[in-house]
């Protein structure tokens, strides 16, 4: 939940109201325009380096695109597809306030960005004219960052949450590949302030990889742990289309292949690379 102290520090943007839905049921362009205007407003208020906000705006655009690709490949019915697309559009709405107020994207050092995103959706009435999909959208947004989904979710929430979690991870892989495989220095916020220290490794992250399980952010101790964790996401993809794109994009393969071939990561590295290849 978002406490009163954080709530009192949130901005109060004056943004063009959303029109009533019209046209194709999977056309959410009005929501995309609202989101872009909101992001620009938050950027104008930011007294820190605003470039991480730009990364999040681009991330949102690509997650929404990935979600659309999955809904089409998996033949998700149009009403459910709209819920998935809106959840993708707004899943990181809280990231802008999170960064502006706390200077980090690390939830444990600031605020749960998924809860903040859902809070802002309701605060700004973004689903007032979308009542038939509101439960699925809000549920998926709140749950998109949890380690494991609860078992007893309503079916609409479960479908939207699973799909958005896949789409989110697919684009996070792109971001991490661009930052860690590039020639420049990677911003510390992108790697959740983990040290780039080759001598540090997490046996818990390695163990998850060897067991074919998704590793937890809570167990990270270094950038190399982060690389391996990203590779373990192959074990948590929920849709065939997601798994194929995970392998086909090449981002995860590059990230994991950059781990040392010898030493503590060797066996886990080989296991994850094999799993990625088999998904392609």
Identify the function of each model-found stretch:
Residues 36-62, 96-107:
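Active-site flanking loop/helix segments enriched in acidic
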Residues 10, 15-29, 52-61, 65, ...:
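Divalent metal-dependent phosphate-bond-processing catalytic cores, especially two-metal-ion Mg2+/Mn2+ enzymes
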Residues 53, 103-111, 124-127, 131:
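Short gly/ser-rich anion-binding loops that grip negatively charged ligand groups
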Residues 32-39, 64, 118, 122, ...:
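An amphipathic alpha-helix signature
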Residues 62-70, 111-125:
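An active-site-proximal "capping" alpha-helix that borders the catalytic cofactor pocket
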Residues 2-9:
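Short, low-complexity S/T/E/D/G/P-rich linear segments that nucleate or cap local secondary structure
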Residues 75-86, 126-143, 156-163:
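Acidic/histidine metal-binding catalytic segments
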Residues 81-106, 117, 136-147:
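His-Asp-centered metal-binding catalytic motifs of divalent-metal-dependent phosphohydrolases/nucleases
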């Amino acid at each position: 939940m978002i406490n009163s102290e954080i709530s009192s520090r949130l901005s109060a943007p004056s943004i063009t109201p959303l029109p009533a839905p019209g046209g194709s049921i999977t056309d959410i362009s009005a929501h995309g325009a609202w989101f872009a205007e909101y992001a620009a407003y938050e950027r104008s208020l930011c007294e820190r380096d605003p470039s991480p906000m730009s990364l999040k705006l681009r991330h949102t655009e690509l997650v929404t695109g990935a979600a659309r690709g999955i809904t089409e490949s998996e033949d998700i019915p149009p009403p459910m597809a709209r819920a998935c697309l809106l959840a993708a559009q707004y899943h990181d709405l809280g990231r802008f306030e999170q960064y502006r107020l706390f200077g980090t994207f690390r939830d444990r050092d600031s605020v749960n960005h998924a809860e903040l995103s859902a809070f802002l959706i309701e605060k700004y009435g973004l689903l007032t004219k979308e009542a038939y999909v509101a439960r699925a959208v809000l549920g998926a947004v709140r749950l998109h960052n949890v380690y494991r989904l609860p078992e007893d979710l309503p079916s609409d929430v479960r479908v939207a949450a699973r799909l958005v979690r896949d789409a989110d991870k697919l684009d996070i892989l792109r971001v991490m590949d661009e930052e860690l495989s590039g020639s420049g220095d990677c911003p510390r916020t992108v790697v959740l302030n983990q040290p780039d220290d080759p001598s540090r490794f997490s046996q818990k992250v390695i163990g998850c990889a060897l067991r074919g399980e998704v590793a937890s952010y809570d167990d990270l101790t270094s950038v190399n742990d982060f690389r391996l964790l990203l590779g373990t996401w192959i074990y948590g993809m929920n849709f065939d289309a997601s798994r194929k794109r995970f392998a086909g994009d090449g981002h995860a393969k590059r990230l994991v292949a950059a781990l040392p071939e010898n030493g503590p990561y060797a066996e886990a590295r080989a296991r994850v690379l094999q799993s990625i290849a088999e998904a392609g």
